[in-house]
A protein has these predicted regions:
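Metal-centered catalytic cores of metalloenzymes
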Residues: 2, 19-84, 88-149
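Sec-dependent bacterial lipoprotein signal peptides
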Residues: 1-19
Length: 149
């Protein structure tokens, strides 16, 4: 048996193993979850409840993996943010904090290892979570966006 004939079964097994690893739920590609639901967001003052007159804006995305892990961030312009959170609440409703975001300059990110509980996972999938950025002038939030996967 030649070396090439001996190598073919080994190469085939390695290729099959790689395919299985790539298809596993919750695997990551480039730091993002390869399965789950993603919500892209555009934050404005008009989305706040009550609405806020501001020129500040923000954008970003959040991804929920099938195991409840959540990742994502928003980047803002025109606001001196003091805090940002993912909150529970349908459009036009205010609610409690589900996840606090960490600030780095004008970017607010979900902390590593953050997970949503089952109720918050269902709320995410139903569009009943929102992200907002608070400021000294608008303690309840200056800009907001609904998470709509």
């Amino acid at each position: 048996m030649t070396l090439v004939k001996k190598a073919i079964p080994v190469i085939a097994l390695v290729a099959l193993a790689a395919c299985q690893t790539m298809s596993d739920a919750g695997s990551t590609v480039g730091g993002w979850f390869s399965s789950g639901k993603t919500a892209n967001v555009k934050l404005t003052g008009a989305e706040q409840n009550p609405p806020v007159a501001t020129s500040a804006t923000g954008s970003g995305s959040f991804t929920l993996a099938t195991d409840g892990a959540v990742k994502g961030s928003v980047t803002t312009t025109g606001v001196q943010g003091t805090a940002a959170h993912i909150h529970r609440g349908a459009k036009g409703q205010n609610g409690g904090v589900a996840v606090g975001l960490t600030k780095n300059g004008d970017t607010y990110s979900v902390p590593d290892g953050a997970k949503l509980n089952e109720a918050d996972q269902a709320a995410f999938k139903a569009g009943n979570l929102y992200v907002n950025v608070h400021s000294a002038a608008n303690k309840g939030g200056e800009i907001r966006a609904q998470l709509l996967p």
